[in-house]
Amino acid sequence: MRIMIVTDAWFPQTNGVVSTLAQTAAWLGRFGHEVRLITPQDFKSVGCPTYPEIRLSLLPYAKVKSSIIEFAPQALHIATEGPLGLAARRICLRHGMRFTTSYHTQFPQYLRARFPMPLSVSYRALRWFHGAAARCMVSTASVRRDLAAHGFQNLSTWHRGVDTGLFKPHPKEFLSLPRPIAAYVGRVAVEKNIDAFLKM
């Protein structure tokens, strides 16, 4: 199958979205699918204000359209709501192409932490973006419940796999440590709300 993934989040960013998409593309290729990615690396871009690692592609519509038409994907997935995602969404709707999207991060909370933007405005924009998709894939049941409570209707849970060649059980050397044991695994960023974890 020819599968196209459109994402505004890509290397050199280091985050779960990039890791998920890179692993997904690699595994789809191993299963015999032909995967094509549209990423900011293919476009002139500028750094996002307050987060320069995020590259915002400039005027991507024509190039995204030609890439989609040339590749003629049998499945098209729009992973992000940025300039590339918006261009791909518009192209799909204009040409009657079905597509899926994914919701990877607590974007409304992220915006509220960095800018004085009400959550209702962010959720309305996200409902508009993802509502046109055949399915909007989310990472967990709790995210699915949260989005459903905010009026999202076309949700599916996209479970993440574990690479057992990389992550495997170790000897139970920590069993004798005093309880409770808590650990945070992830990036240090304002949207991760690590303060709440540290106050446990």
Regions of interest found by a model, annotated:
Residues 123-170, 176-177, 184:
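Donor nucleotide-sugar binding/catalytic pocket of nucleotide-sugar-dependent glycosyltransferases
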Residues 1-44:
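N-terminal subdomain of nucleotide-sugar transferases
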Residues 3, 75, 90-110, 137, ...:
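Active-site proximal beta-strand in glycosyltransferases
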Residues 171-198:
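Conserved donor-binding/catalytic core segment of Leloir-type glycosyltransferases
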Residues 98-100, 107-128, 138, 164:
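Nucleotide-sugar donor phosphate/pyrophosphate-binding loop at the beta->alpha transition
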Residues 8-10, 160, 184-189:
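Conserved donor-binding loops in enzymes that form glycosidic bonds
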Residues 64-85, 95-100:
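Short N-terminal targeting/anchoring amphipathic segment
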Residues 50-67:
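Glycine-rich, highly charged phosphate/nucleotide-binding loops
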